[in-house]
């Protein structure tokens, strides 16, 4: 089983809760030979593609037979990160396990199963 942590850090303007940028960190905690950590900035990338294949189309890939070639996407829209199964048009062949909504808002502590991989979502706190 692969365990992945997702950390999100948001920058705010004048305490108005207006998000100008959000950093999303995906970290493999358990299950692969090498530990990996990738951070995505919403100002540069609004769609993160997750899957099994290594290609220019996949931003975060896993060597897991139970993960589809194009498993899911994490999308930054309306100042929030969302996860959606498949490539946005077609669902993944192996499924992404979360509530049965098309787009699911990534909240603090959310756990998502993709194949045998577990994702845990947490927000980074600015100190």
Give the label of every model feature segment.
Residues 1-63, 122-127:
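Intrinsically disordered, low-complexity acidic Ser/Thr-rich regulatory segments
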Residues 117-121:
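Short, charged beta-turn/beta-strand-edge "cap" motif at the junction between a beta-strand
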Residues 41-115:
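Forkhead-associated
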């Amino acid at each position: 089983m692969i365990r992945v942590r997702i950390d999100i850090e948001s920058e705010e303007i004048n305490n108005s809760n207006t998000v100008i940028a959000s950093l999303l960190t995906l970290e493999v905690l358990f299950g692969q030979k090498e530990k990996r950590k990738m951070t995505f900035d919403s100002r540069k990338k609004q769609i993160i593609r997750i899957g099994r294949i290594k290609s220019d189309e996949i931003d975060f890939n896993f060597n897991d037979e139970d993960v589809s070639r194009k498993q899911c996407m994490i999308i930054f829209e309306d100042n929030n990160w969302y996860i959606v199964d498949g490539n946005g048009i077609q669902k993944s062949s192996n499924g992404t396990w979360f509530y049965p909504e098309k787009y699911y808002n990534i909240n603090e502590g959310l756990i998502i199963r993709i194949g045998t991989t577990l994702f845990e979502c947490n927000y980074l706190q600015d100190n």
